[in-house]
């Protein structure tokens, strides 16, 4: 009933490893919902938890246990250890590396369409851009961010392997990552469309479509945020703060429901995104 020839061809062409941060207590709820929905369309998925001696021995190959303490204060260490592991074991097998939370929903076909306009052999960093803490800003961790193969290689070899070069624990993980990427000359690239609409959402779809404006979003967003029908790109890529039941509903609406007589125009979306590097901020970001 659905002609998905174009999307299937694209899905095979671009290889993405997805890594999802979670905790043991939500493996059977949030992580399971991710695994049963959008993660099925990743080329490889790893669910990352902090190692805990009290946990049973891991027999599932899609669960990565990293040796860091549990808790939000150690999310930077969790990210650093995960990226080192992925670099050492999977770097040449995949083109792009997506980080998401266990309450993030990703429309993989739309992400791969965006990535088809970029070259994974160049140092590229993508996501929802906030305008604080560095010359270019940083990508929201909850909306999901993406590194090219070249970016990951540079991050680990020129950043994490040099003692003291990059923060490896404490602070906000998404900010720490942005600082390290900037220090090794990995470039921020655009994910907004030609109408100025976002494709990665740091808040829930309800917040962006219905409002009110999430607190602080106008102050923090690199691009002018919009609430309502013009909030988000037609080829939306991610939602944040998605509960497991709504994740299943999104999956059904996107992949099991159609509107009769409506068909996307390939020509109309071919040049939808503003592709290219993002310019540095014209003022000193607050720290």
What are these regions (language model features)?
Residues 1-287:
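Secretory-pathway lumenal glyco-enzymes, predominantly type II signal-anchor Golgi glycosyltransferases
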């Amino acid at each position: 009933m659905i002609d998905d020839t174009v999307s299937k061809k694209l899905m095979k062409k671009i290889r993405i490893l997805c890594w999802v941060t979670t905790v043991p207590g939500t493996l059977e709820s949030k992580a399971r919902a991710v695994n049963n929905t959008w993660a099925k369309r990743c080329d490889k998925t790893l669910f990352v938890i902090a190692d805990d001696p009290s946990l049973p021995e891991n027999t599932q190959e899609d669960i990565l246990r990293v040796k860091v303490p549990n808790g939000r204060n150690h999310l930077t260490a969790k990210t650093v250890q995960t990226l080192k592991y992925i670099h050492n074991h999977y770097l040449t097998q995949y083109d792009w590396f997506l980080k998401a939370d266990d309450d993030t929903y990703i429309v993989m076909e739309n992400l791969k369409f965006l990535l088809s306009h970029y070259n994974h052999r160049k140092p590229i960093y993508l996501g929802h851009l906030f305008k604080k803490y560095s010359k270019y800003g940083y990508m929201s961790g909850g909306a999901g961010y993406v590194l090219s193969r070249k970016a990951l290689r540079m991050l680990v070899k020129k950043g994490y392997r040099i003692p003291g070069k990059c923060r490896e624990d404490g602070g906000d993980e998404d900010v720490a990552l942005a600082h390290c990427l900037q220090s090794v000359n990995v470039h921020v690239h655009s994910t907004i469309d030609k109408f100025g609409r976002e494709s990665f959402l740091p808040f829930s779809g309800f917040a962006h479509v219905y409002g009110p404006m999430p607190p602080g979003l106008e102050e923090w967003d690199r691009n002018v945020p919009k609430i309502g029908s013009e909030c988000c790109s037609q080829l939306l890529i991610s939602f944040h703060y998605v509960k497991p039941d709504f994740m299943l509903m999104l999956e059904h609406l996107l992949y099991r429901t159609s509107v009769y007589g409506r068909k996307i125009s390939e020509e109309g979306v071919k040049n939808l995104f503003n592709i290219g590097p993002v310019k540095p901020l014209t003022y000193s970001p607050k720290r």
